[in-house]
Amino acid sequence: MVSEYIDSELKRLEDYALRRVKGIPNNRRLWVLTCMDERVHIEQSLGIQPDDAHIYRNAGGIVTDDAIRSASLTTNFFGTKEIIVVTHTDCGMLRFTGEEVAKYFISKGIKPTEVQLDPLLPAFRISSEEDFIKWFKFYEDLGVKSPDEMALKGVEILRNHPLIPKDVRITGYVYEVETHRLRKPNQIIYNETSKFEHGTIVKE
């Protein structure tokens, strides 16, 4: 009956709209941290749909204080049981340093110690130019040399953070913008295959 179909759709739409009120988690109980780079097609690479996960993006896919804020909320109150950290090749956070960016803003007349970083926390201010440089969190300033290292570092930080439940599964991957594929950190298949001129003979 048409009326039964309509009633069923209305119920489905109501449940969808009231997910938070009814305590319904996202479809995969998943939170993803990745870079804001538009070349990272995160849903496609993970094989997920828009309703399957909470997606958090920032410059570099770095575990910042705000990333931790979101991760702690989704895992403690929204039913999330898995976190995936995805960095990517050719990331802009590898191309500059915090010092270069800080100098740019200073040349524009910005005074680091007078910058209000969080409008909701007026007391949270940078106390020195050095802290201003660190605040941008470019890979080099964090002692990180590759997206692989950053993915592993992000996983480690989240696993050891007191606001993230210990039963949450946390893994990291690297998205290759050249191939549009994910891989595990430090597992570069292309480099391995390119070492050999001939394939290995398969033995029976």
Swiss-Prot record:
Q: Which family does it belong to?
A: Belongs to the beta-class carbonic anhydrase family.
Q: What class of enzyme is it?
A: hydrolase
Task: Tell me where the signal peptide lies.
Answer: none
Q: Which gene encodes it?
A: csh
The entry's keywords: Hydrolase, Metal-binding, Zinc
| Cofactor(s) required for function per UniProt | Zn(2+)
**Which reactions appear under catalytic activity for this entry?**
carbon disulfide + 2 H2O = 2 hydrogen sulfide + CO2 + 2 H(+)
- The reply on keyword Hydrolase is yes
Put simply, this protein is called: Carbon disulfide hydrolase
- Oligomeric state and partners? Forms a hexadecameric catenane homooligomer, through interactions of two interlocked octameric rings. Exists as both octamers and hexadecamers in solution.
Q: Which residues bind Zn(2+)?
A: C35, H88, C91
Output the superkingdom of the source species: Archaea
Family annotation (InterPro entries)? Carbonic_anhydrase, Carbonic_anhydrase_sf
What pathway does this protein act in?
Sulfur metabolism; hydrogen sulfide biosynthesis
GO MF term list: carbonate dehydratase activity; hydrolase activity; identical protein binding; zinc ion binding
Its EC number(s): 3.13.1.5
The record's section on Pfam families has: Pro_CA
